[in-house]
Amino acid sequence: MQAIAKNDIKTGTVVDLTHEGHGVVKIDRFPIFIPQALINEQIEYKIIKVKKNFAIGKLLNINTRSENRVAPPCIYYERCGGCQLQHLSYEAQLEMKKEQVINLFQRKAHFDNSKINDTVGMTDPWRYRNKSQIPVGKNEQNEVIMGFYRQRSHDIIDMESCLIQDSQHQEVMNEVKSILKDLNVSIYQEQLKKGLMRHLVVRTGYHTDEMMIIFVTNGKKWPQKNAVVEKILDAFPNVTSIKQNINDSHSNVIMGRQSITLYGKDTIIDQLTDSTFKISDQSFYQINSEQTEKLYNKAIEYAQLTGNEVVLDTYCGIGTIGLYMAPHAKHVYGVEVVPSSIEDAQQNATINQCNNTTFVCGKAEEVILQWKAQGIKPDVVMVDPPRKGCDETFIQTLLTLEPKRIVYISCNPATQQRDALLLAEKYQLEEVTPVDMFPQTTHVETVALFNLK
């Protein structure tokens, strides 16, 4: 193999894209990963890091450009870590995400008879985020900065706009930055673990335009609190809720456990098709409301509900998917380990007049065995776990339950593939549909249908 050393300047042809969106050039089968390089491009690059099994390169010149390369519209794209694919046409982004799923399920796990559908995309893949989490800091000149982190770091890129956030959020961000400066609010400095203001979080109802503004502070005491609220109301008189969240943990976790309502309601309202949901500052709620409706509609299609089925909604959160399915089912049973989420789910069931739902707090693998002992036999089980996927104990419990169908929504297809191999003992993976919940990024959500063999 050719010698490869740091600072070498080389040329080559990009033959693949990684799941992180990096171009791959190979030298005698040894891979070099190069951010922002695209398949079929002939490039010049510099080796910046060499490991035992791979190297990292920096793109210097593109000698032959891909037909899928586009000019990134965001002026911060080269520095900000929020997006990874703005230089790739949207049609090619959707195809790349489908290829990721094919690679996981067919090439690696050999689900050769399972259908992988085209990625469900957006008509306008911008301004889709209904929640923004914006770190606050200071630059070397001791000025207040707000924006998003540089890739793989906690260095804040100061910015005035973000093309994937709701446009209202950037208006709030810029106004808050001005208010913090004017009132000389203490700013948290992560390295020193000192200061007050840590994050600004903004949530909006996609269909209702209700807005919640949350200030995350390092401690409860905040001398300028009332003045900040007054200035926010002057600038945004229609704001629904203003809250203070206290996080003094000095960790990477953005929000703490305690929240105080400073103005307005404790929650905001949003709608998904015909269902209404109360959303608190801590609620898990899908970031992209438009794509969530498409995702849930595909899940209902896979569930094949006629009105006579008993549905178990595991990892149910605030009840969004379960309540979405309730009008089409005989009864929906939801289970979630977070107590506040179950309280929200129960309230949401009342708001939507869903009398055919039951929501219980506990570990899914334990609660569903209790339901089984009570004679509750599900026809369909909904699974929507966090990125780490399902606990193996839960999978084994599910196998003993033997529902006719399992509909599995995942924000991490790699762990979904792992779980699919365990479910294969009794279930046939019929098909997987990727849904583009996060355009311009490498993330892809999937929904899969498993039928009992």
Swiss-Prot record:
Pfam families from the UniProt entry: tRNA_U5-meth_tr
Catalytic site positions: C411
Disulfide partners: none
Biological process per Gene Ontology, one example term: rRNA base methylation
Keywords associated with the record: 4Fe-4S, Iron, Iron-sulfur, Metal-binding, Methyltransferase, S-adenosyl-L-methionine, Transferase
Gene3D superfamilies: 2.40.50.1070, Nucleic acid-binding proteins, Vaccinia Virus protein VP39
Binding site for S-adenosyl-L-methionine: Q286, Y315, E336, D384
Keyword Ribosomal protein annotated: no
Domain of life: Bacteria
Keyword Methyltransferase: yes
Residues that, per the record, bind [4Fe-4S] cluster: C74, C80, C83, C162
EC number(s) recorded for this UniProt protein: 2.1.1.-
Gene Ontology molecular function: any one: metal ion binding
Protein family membership: Belongs to the class I-like SAM-binding methyltransferase superfamily. RNA M5U methyltransferase family.
Listed name of the protein: Uncharacterized RNA methyltransferase SA1713
Organism: Staphylococcus aureus (strain N315)
